[in-house]
């Protein structure tokens, strides 16, 4: 039993990608964004399919994780939106806790 000589090896497609964190500088049409990476380079980022299908909003000023190909470092795919430190959601939860405390003290 001879093996084929021209047989392709299975490669992990994620090996050719580098992940960075960046800041969204500008929103462009069709789910495209200008993103400034940690090393101060500005690249064009597009939304990944999972983010698009789950309707996650990405706005200017958001911090994101972006995958950049080694072969074309001018474009990247936004794979994750990082949570804000001073998010409105955390403020809302603090407000509801304060309301619960005031109700408990009154009743």
Swiss-Prot record:
Domain called S1-like: residue spans: 8-83
Key words, A-Z: Chloroplast, Initiation factor, Plastid, Protein biosynthesis, RNA-binding, rRNA-binding
Chain intervals for the UniProt region annotation (Disordered): 81-107
Entry-linked SMART domains: S1
SUPFAM superfamilies: Nucleic acid-binding proteins (SSF50249)
Keyword 4Fe-4S on entry: no
UniProt xrefs under Gene3D superfamilies: Nucleic acid-binding proteins
Cellular compartment(s): Plastid, Chloroplast
Entry's family note: Belongs to the IF-1 family.
Protein name according to UniProt: Translation initiation factor IF-1, chloroplastic
Source lineage: Eukaryota, Viridiplantae, Streptophyta, Embryophyta, Tracheophyta
Gene: infA
């Amino acid at each position: 039993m001879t093996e084929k000589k021209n047989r392709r090896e299975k490669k992990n497609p994620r090996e050719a990608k580098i992940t960075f964190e960046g800041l969204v500088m500008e929103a462009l049409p069709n789910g495209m964004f200008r993103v400034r990476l940690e090393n101060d380079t500005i690249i064009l980022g597009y939304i990944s399919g999972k983010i698009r299908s789950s309707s996650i909003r990405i706005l200017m000023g958001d911090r994101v994780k972006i995958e950049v190909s080694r072969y074309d470092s001018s474009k990247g795919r936004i794979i994750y939106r990082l949570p804000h430190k001073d998010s409105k959601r955390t403020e809302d939860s603090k407000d509801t806790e304060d309301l619960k405390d005031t109700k408990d003290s009154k009743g």
